Structure formats: C-alpha cells, structure tokens
UniProtKB/Swiss-Prot annotation:
Taxonomic source organism: Dictyostelium discoideum (Social amoeba)
Residues annotated as domain VIT: 63-194
Name by which UniProt lists this protein: von Willebrand factor A domain-containing protein DDB_G0292740
Compositional bias (Pro residues): 720-749
Composition bias type Polar residues, residue spans: 803-815
Pfam families documented for this protein: VIT (PF08487), VWA_3 (PF13768)
Residue ranges constituting the VWFA domain according to the UniProt record: 346-515
Amino acid sequence: MIKNLISAFSQGVGIQKKELPSTIILNKDDYKEANYYNYYRNLELNKPDEVLARRIAGLAPIAYQYYNVSSFDNNQFKIVDFSIDSKLNDTCLTCVWTQTYKNESKTPVEAVYRIPLSPLSTVSAFSVQFNGKTLHGKIKDSTKAQEKYDDAIASGGQAFLAEKSKDDDNYFNFKLGNIPPTESSITIHITMISEIGSHLNSLHYLLHRYCFPQSSNYNFSLSLSVNLSNSIKSIFFDGDKSHSLQYENKEKTKCIIQYKKSLGFNTQPNILIVFELDDLNKPQSFIEKLSINKEDIKNNPHSDSDSDSDDEENKKENEKSSYAIALNFFPKFESINKEDIYQKGEFIFLIDCSGSMSGNPIDSARRALEIIIRSLNEQCKFNIYCFGSGFNKAFQEGSRKYDDDSLAVVNRYVSNISANLGGTELLQPIKDILSKEIDPEYPRQIFILTDGAVSDRSKLIEFVSKESKTTRIFTYGIGSSVDVELVVGLSKACKGYYTLIRNSSDMETEVMKLLSIAFEPTLSNVSFDWSQLLDLSNGKSTTIIQSPTQIRPIFNNERMMVYATIELDNDISNNIENHGQPVIVTMNADGPLGDRLSYHVELDFKNYSQSNSIHTLAAFKRIQDLEEIERKSSKETEKLEIIKLGKKYNLVSKHTSLVVTSDSDSPTEDTMKVINILPNNSQHPIIVDRCHTFAVNFNSPLQYQQQQQQQQQNFNSGFAPPPPPMMSSGPPPPPGSSFGAPPPPPPGGAFPTSSISEKKSSSQSSSSYLPPTMSLSRKSSLSPSSPSKNYPSPKLSSPSLSYGSTQSESTPSNDPLISLLAKQKANGSWSKSSIQDQFSSAISKIPNELSAVEDVWATLLVISKIMKTFASQKSKWELSVQKSNKWVKQQLLKLNLSFDQFLELAKSNV
C-alpha cells in the first residue's frame, strides 16, 4: 500500500468537523500508475496544452481555441457555476454535474462540446432547466434521437442532445440547440455512473483538471457522500486545505467530504481523494433493491414511450422486486512461498527480428530466450513468435504444453533466430494470437521485445485494449531508437509492465524481472456459483445476469469487481429477505498453489440500500459485454439488447442517446450560430480500455513501478526532437534512412496504410531518440485484413520437427550459466548423463540413500554449482532453480529424506 499515506482523521465522529491538514504526503505520481488513470494519461499525451484541453470542456466560439480570448467580445456562452454531487460505495460512483451557463450571444446559438468520459463511466441522466421549467432527457435509439433533435431545431424549438461519440473514442457529445439570445440562464444536469477507480488496496476518487472549463471566474463546489461496507483506515486529499470531512458513524464507514473554490483561467490541479480500507482477505458484497410499480413507470420522466410493447414489457418486468449485487475482492498472497507457486499460465513471446536488431540486440534476445524457456514449468503452455515484415512461430497450431518434447522444438527454434525478417509489423502476429480462444485455466500473458516503431501504433494499442479482460502484456523497449509510447501504451492497455533497456548487454536481467512478475500469485478461471440464491426461488424460473461475464484473472495486487442483477416476484423477495440466514454465493478460482479454491460470500438481503446506482452500473457493464460481442460478431441481436438495456436503465451507449426537445413559445426565426468546441479536423485522444490497477512487485509494493518511473525519466531526459514524417506505402527505404514513431494522424484521424514498418537506423545516436509522444485515434473495430505473410521458421528445414528427443538439444554456448541451464529437463531436473563430463568427480560421491535416484543427486549438484558460482546472476536462474528444488523435494519426500541435508552435502562437493 502507499507508504506515505497518512490518516487525516483519526478522531472525530458525528457532528465533529475538521479542516484537512495540508501536511499529508503522497507519492505524487503514484496514482498515475493506476489502471484507471491510463485514460487520462492518454488524454494528457494527446492534449499536452492544458489551456486548450480545458477550453474543450467549456462552451466557447470555435476560434477561441486558436486566438487570444481578449480579441473577442462577450458574445459567448459563459459558465457561471459548476457543482458536483457525488455518492461513493464499495464499487460504484454516482456523480451529478450541474453547470449553469449564460448565453450572451446576439444570435440564436447551437453549442457543441465534448466531455471526456472514462471507459469506466457512462451517462445515465440528463436534464435542462430554463425559462422556469425542467426538461428531462429520454433515452431513444441514437438514430431516432438525432432525428428528433433535428426536427425540433428546424421547427424553431429548443433541443438538447447527449450521446456517445460516434468514433468510439469515449467522449460524451453534448449539444444545445436554438438557444435564443438574452435568454435567462440555462442549467444542465448530467448524471454519470462509474466503477470506482482503485489502486493496490485503496479506492480513488479523481476529478481530472481537464474536466474544469477554462473560462472567466466561476464558482465550483464538490460534495462527496461515502458509504462503504468496510471501515476507513485513512483518507488522503491531493489538493488545497479547504476540504472538510465529517464522519457519520463510529465505525467510520460513512462520511461526507466537501470542497469549494473559485475557478477560472488559472492552472487547476487534479482533485484526488484516496480511501485506504481495513484489510479483509475475502470478497465483500453490497446489495441494492428496487421495487417499482406500474405507477412509477408511468410517471418516470426518463421513460421512453416509442412503442406500447416496450411499455408493457417494462411494466410487467417492474412488477417484481429487483436486486443488484456488487462483489469486490482484493486478495493478498503474503504468506505464499515462491517455491510453492504452481499455477497454470500461457506465455507467448514476440521477438522483433527486423534488420535493426542485428548484432548485439538479437544475440542478447536469443540468450534471454534460452534462459526464459528454462524458467517455465510443466503447468505452462507457451509459444514464440518472430516478427518483422511478416512473422513465424515455433508452434503453428498454437501454444503447446511445456514438456521435454516441446522444449526440444523451441530450443532448436531459438538457436536459429536471427534479425532477417525486414521491417516491423507487430499488428498481424498480435491478431494471430488474440484470434485464438482463451483457455480460462491458462491466463494469457504476452511478452513483446522490440527496438523500434511500428506503422500502425494507434490501431495496435486500440486493438489490444479490447482484450484486457483476457490478456496481460509485458513490453521491453531496446535501445535509444525505440518508440517509447508503443512500449508503454501496449503494456498499460492490458494492465501489464514495461521496461526500457538502453544497453542490450543487460537484456537477460531485465527480461527476467518482468517474467518473475508474471509468475506472481494469481487467481484464475474465476466463476461464481449462484445456486443457493436460485434454490430460494421456489422452483420459479429465475435469471441472474452477471457482468462482466468473463472475469479477468486476479493478478497480484489487482482488484476484482463483479455485478449481478436478479428480478424476483414479491413473494419470493420476501422469502429471501426473511430467510433467517445470509444467502451464500461461492466464488471459485484456480489458486497459485495449483489447487481449486472456494470463497464463500455472504449476501445479507435484509441489509440493502434503496437506490439504483448498482443496478445502473451492472447494466452498463452488461452493455460493455454486449458491445464487445457485437464488435466480434456484428450481429443485430446484441444491438437490440443494448437498446433495451439502455432504455430500461436510461443509459447512453453506442446505440442509445438522451434527447430533450421543447416547443418554443416564440419560434426562433433568426439564423442560428453554431458554437463548435472541437473542430472536425482536430486530433482526438485515444481512449484505451481500463488499464486499469498496476501490478506491483510481489515482495515490495511500489518498488518496481518507482524504478520504472525513474527509468523512463532517465531514458527520456534531454531528447525532444519533433517526430519525422511517416513514410507512405512503398518499397523499403534506402540504407541509412532514419525512421521513428509515426506522426499524428491527418485530418479525420486516419493513418495512411503502410506495408513496411518504419524504424530508426540502429546507427543513430541516442540524441535522435523520440520522446514518448502518442498520436492515436480510436476508431471502430478493426476489420479483418488480408493474412500477413507467415514466414517459415528461421533456418528450419521443416515446420514439422521431430519430437523424438526427450531432452532438449542445445547448441554450445559461450555463457557457462546458459550452458548448464540448456541441459535442464522440463520438470527441472538434470540427468546424470547430461552433466557427467563436468561433474564426474562429484557424481561418483553419490550418497547411498540416492543410489537408486541418480538424477536427484545430479540435480542437487547443478543447483549447488549455480548458487555458488553464479550468485551475482540470481535473477537469471532463480525461476529455473525454483522448479529444480521443487522436483528434488518431491523425490526426496517419497524416500522420506531431508532436502536441506542433501543440498548441503552437494554444496560441499562442487
């Protein structure tokens, strides 16, 4: 947990109120490594000018973005007040933004602007107050909503439209149309529902500075009501000391935080509130109940009455009681011994074999792979890809189980790797990997090693971000010419790690650091058993909708959040609430020791909250599931269900929008002035899915990520040349040409297609290295492209190799450590025959107790030799020796012999 997190309020309950001390200290960049912050990180990369970014968040003339504001008169749409009323529970955050604007234009106005909307968030309500009346937005099919908006404007009425950005970049589009001049102030209410941000074992409430309009002075106020199921250990505020806090109970599970400030043109810092909770190593639950009768449906201002059939269906459904359940879990694995970890996993390694990797880089990569393949164990599946202008792979059919046969194949494959595959096209091998169905028993982890840039970085990062629920990515950037933002962006898009390797001679050590993180304890193949809840339905058909349907493996220092909704007849609802005992839901998962674990979660249906926030969030997560299915299948069934859920829970989505129209008492006849905040040719930020909680080192939280931050600062220091122009399609450039990261997309956001990946010449000096600039545009899903050239495995006579050898065939190595590791079997042992020449004297001294198991003695000798001779290179051999120790202990246990005793004996003989 955050080391310097200090409790702001150890005293004070009930009406006692305190000003927050300004001395609380937090590592300033720590929260920026959280998965949820990746959205804002990309926002900052694409809009580094804070003034420009904040102008987008407010209403102003289009030229306001490009010229000095003093050159304009006051014909503007001005914000005069901005307040946020938020409610936070264990998993869910509900925010009501209230913004009051004054139209000082001399002509009717259509104002257009976009609000950044995190992938964790959606809009669930929208209303407008003007001329003494309040108009509520109604959810409609997006096409119908746009038509209704256009019709209202054409007839001289007022209209307001809220919708998700059509280009899928997670912006919220907001249009106010036909507002007459000198009108009284207009107040907009926008309700947003969001999954709470988390980092390590803390919950985060963040208001990013880009959300605050850049305008003349206006009042801002924040009220945050907190209701948690667990006691609050400490609260951290990153901001000025004008915050105040009031606890509402002695258990410190409820509190209210308030903040007021005058904002304007000055630089605005992020507002961050961090909650550290008491540790509970079991899943927590939060229950919400809704009981809606027919009269409620009839009077609901948000309900859409496009069709009688929809109304009747909604009425029928809402005669029942509806429950929403939120489950969250932050497991801890502090007591697990590393040698005992025996979890399943799929490991896929992608090696850049383009021309610029020739020489030391590819030699180091090959040596690193020789160590890596000995560090895996028999619980793994694995594969290796070499990519350049095309790609090839060790196993054409996909990842294979790790055993002596597959190890022999890969050993020969690795020995023939060379930098002979031309350019750098990474998208096609990534597509090949992600097109294969995930095996939930084997969490998929991808390791990418590259020294350059790709021609389609934006598509690549956007594509992999869609698979963050199934895949974790680790990236290695080699040398000074690497596209740093490619390295960082890929890893963060899928909640992994990255490292930047300036000197290829350090590659083996750096590669093993990330591989060690991939072997940290994990809960995988997670599922929930809701059968006890279903049993209480008295035989009536009952459906529980869980979202997300596919649960991401819970890697070390990550938090799981899962939601479920269930609708019951009122008699069944009463039966469950009066059951007398909590209902048990069982969470099942494959544990880090190789066993199947079960966690019992108690659902106390007597202790529920009467609100709709979890219902709405559960529906939003379900819509996200459906949108992902639709992306892959393009079937209309998902679209129809998305629209149905959007209407039922009043949610803006890809296919639904909120629209408000009003007939004007005096139809507007003047020409309407369009105030466009974001011009069509401006560059839109990429929004990368939930990169959510940043994994940390198993032994020392934050240590590794702090090293990464410092490493990137050192790596970037002093190098800031502008990116060179991206090359268009065509033949490879002449030798000596300089390549770099692609430039920002042209107007419209599209990149030109390139068949050759550009890369800097490896001969360039480090001063030519490009800084981490990210010029990306998130578009609709990638359409299937023509198959890439699938090159045959390098220098192999046939892709179908002989699997007859039960032990790896290794090529001689000048590195004595690698030479020893190359003789290791898949189970971690060394055979007597494989080390006879090197250990002939020591082998002859085999203890009598081990005479029947000669390979055990041989393995102990090699372990002892490695530990003694290569102690300074422990990071390279640690995983290999761990599986060797495990194998030896298993054999000695059968003989009722002591591991420590015979290890000491072996050490004395080497």
